[in-house]
């Protein structure tokens, strides 16, 4: 059985009606990301983040390099890519930190998985409404989806997502919130 479970929770640490998340400050513990094809599926290549808009190893605003003329950003209409997390063999470790300077809320993400997909609501079009009736517009939330690499079954050099009969699967991801 091929198994690659994740979650798709949206966050806006500045609050529901605060607009987009481009001023959120993001840090990712990843030296590589997975480039995608025109269908936004990883090609099998691992590309270094150094010197690219995908370098979040040091904290920076999500929107800082978003409008860079990078082919990968154009394919995903923004960030919709998987990062190859450092220290995968070490189990649960801190993989990310996000801060809203507006609210001073900090979110830390911990996981034992090898990848995290950053999606910044590139295709939210205002048709979804919140419980309070607010329309979710483009980039009004971000997702950090811990997972194995997308397209793993078709990519030999990616970690296997095959679960054999009798095997059990365990994974842990946690989100820690605090006020800075």
Language-model segments: which ranges?
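An exposed, glycine/acidic-rich loop-and-rim segment of catalytic or binding clefts
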Residues: 1-180
């Amino acid at each position: 059985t091929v198994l690659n479970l994740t979650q798709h929770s949206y966050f806006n640490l500045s609050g529901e009606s605060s607009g987009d998340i481009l001023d959120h400050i993001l840090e990712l513990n990843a030296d590589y990301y997975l480039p995608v094809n025109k269908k936004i599926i990883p090609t099998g290549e691992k590309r270094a983040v150094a010197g690219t808009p995908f370098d979040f190893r040091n904290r920076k605003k999500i929107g800082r390099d978003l409008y860079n003329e990078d082919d990968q950003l154009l394919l995903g209409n923004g960030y919709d890519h998987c990062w190859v997390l450092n220290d995968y063999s070490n189990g649960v470790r801190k993989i990310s930190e996000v801060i809203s300077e507006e609210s001073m809320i900090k979110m830390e993400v911990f996981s034992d998985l090898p990848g995290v997909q950053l999606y910044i609501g590139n295709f939210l079009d205002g048709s979804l409404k919140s419980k309070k009736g607010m329309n979710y517009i483009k980039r009004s939330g971000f997702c950090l989806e811990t997972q194995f690499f997308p397209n793993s079954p078709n990519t030999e050099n990616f970690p296997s997502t095959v679960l054999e009969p009798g095997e059990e699967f365990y994974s842990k991801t946690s989100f820690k919130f605090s006020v800075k």
